[in-house]
């Protein structure tokens, strides 16, 4: 909402793309107060129809739907990985960054960044319900987990900002 108000105050067009495992809603960029209020209302009322996350699908949609170069923001926890813990969106991110001025705002809980050494832990994906075991006693596993999202953003040459979910900014 803050980004939308800021863009509107600058007399820029504002649009929104809501996604889960698919693109759920696209509001094309426009100017005007009523359009801005529609985006805010949709943001407050949005309830995903599907579980999961597919960041690459959203980035491909952005790249195809918006033909002219634009400033765009991706707000996500970036927890969209394959079985080898590689981001599923790596290629789509590189393409979107090359086409648009894309900034990634990585929202996270600080407890997600530092995995404590407590041995085998069963974790559950909040979106899909899938469960798996993680060996937190492995230093390599902890280091890999702590560094992967930063490395992907750096490699894609995307401007990144990290927001802690426990902080209130407004």
In which residue ranges do the predicted regions lie?
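Conserved beta-strand segments of the P-loop GTPase G domain that flank and frequently precede/overlap
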Residues: 74-77, 105-107
């Amino acid at each position: 909402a803050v980004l939308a108000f800021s863009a509107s105050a600058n007399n820029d067009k504002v649009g929104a793309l809501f996604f889960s495992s698919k693109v759920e809603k696209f509001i094309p960029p426009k100017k005007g107060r009523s359009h801005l209020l529609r985006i805010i209302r949709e943001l407050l009322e949005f309830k995903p129809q599907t579980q999961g996350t597919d960041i690459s699908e959203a980035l491909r949609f952005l790249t195809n739907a918006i033909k002219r170069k634009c400033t765009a923001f991706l707000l996500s926890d970036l927890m969209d990985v394959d079985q080898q813990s590689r981001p599923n969106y790596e290629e789509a991110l590189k393409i979107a960054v090359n086409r648009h001025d894309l900034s990634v705002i990585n929202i996270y809980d600080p407890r997600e960044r530092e995995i404590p050494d407590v041995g085998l832990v069963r974790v559950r994906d909040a979106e899909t319900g899938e469960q798996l075991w993680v060996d937190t006693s492995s230093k390599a596993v902890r280091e890999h987990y702590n560094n992967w999202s930063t490395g992907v953003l750096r490699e894609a040459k995307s401007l990144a900002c990290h927001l802690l979910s426990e902080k209130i900014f407004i």
